[in-house]
Amino acid sequence: MAVATVDHRLRAQAADEAAMVAARCRELVVPHVTLVADEPVAGASVQARAREVRYRLLARWADSAGVEAVATAHHADDQAETFLMRAARGSGLAGLAGVRARAVIGGAVVVRPLLDWRRAELRAIARRREMPFVDDPSNQDLRYDRARARRLLDEHEWLGPANIARSAAYLAEADADLRATVDWLWAARATVDGDDVRVDAAGLPREVRRRLARRAVAAAREAAGIAEPAFTDATNVEALLDGLEAGKRVTQSGVLASVREGRWRLRPAPLRRG
């Protein structure tokens, strides 16, 4: 086992906090390293950018250190906060499933073994064992969505963070099952010939078609080397689906899609002249 602490360089106190972790690890004879952000963490969403940088650094460290999995301390309250934040943004099934117990991020296997535990329970254990810990002041900064969600849960215990976390786990299970179904349908109904992608989507439910559409667009973009505009497995494809349902030709993220008798064809969109 080894421990890594990420210093995002967002707060002056972070270096001292990393040193505290390093000292505790020395007492336990556990290898420790502090990973310092190698680029400024800034932008419209500082917390989202910090997460991106954090997991990139952890993935790089895991690879170089031969670590099989990175374990994080996300707990049930974190899960409930994530659920509320994403519900407020109108997220679908995959988003409401929240933080996964196991995921691959940046090539690293990430596990979260504490998702069934409440924050207060973990604090109590740490105090009984006289384990030092630090409260991140940004968790109380109401400029951030997560801090506002945390305040809401703290002030309204009836919301039941543990129950919300349990619901997120059920949704994660449903999302995984649906993902497996889409994998099977992709193998059975899709053909990829270079940057020419064809999918038989006839008779399929909209959520299945939504996921197949994202995969088809991604496949065409990858084959054609299209990098801009950005496209992820969370990109909104509703206009694309609506257009295909109406029998129209539609462009999505640099890919031209057309339909005939329920069969889609996606290929790179022609470059605009002028």
Give residue ranges: language-model regions:
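Residues that cap or delimit alpha-helices
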Residues: R118, E157, L204-R206
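Short, surface-exposed loop/turn segments at secondary-structure junctions
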Residues: D136-Q140, P161, G225-E228
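AMP-forming adenylation/ATP pyrophosphatase catalytic core
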Residues: A2, V6-H8, A37-E39, V53, ...
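Residue-level detector of well-ordered alpha-helical segments, enriched
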Residues: Q79, N163, V208-L212
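Core alpha/beta nucleotide-donor-binding catalytic domains of modification enzymes
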Residues: M1-L152
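Short alpha-helical scaffolding segments that buttress acidic/His motifs in well-ordered protein cores
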Residues: F83-L84, I164-A168
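Conserved anion/nucleotide-ligand pocket segment
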Residues: R151-N163
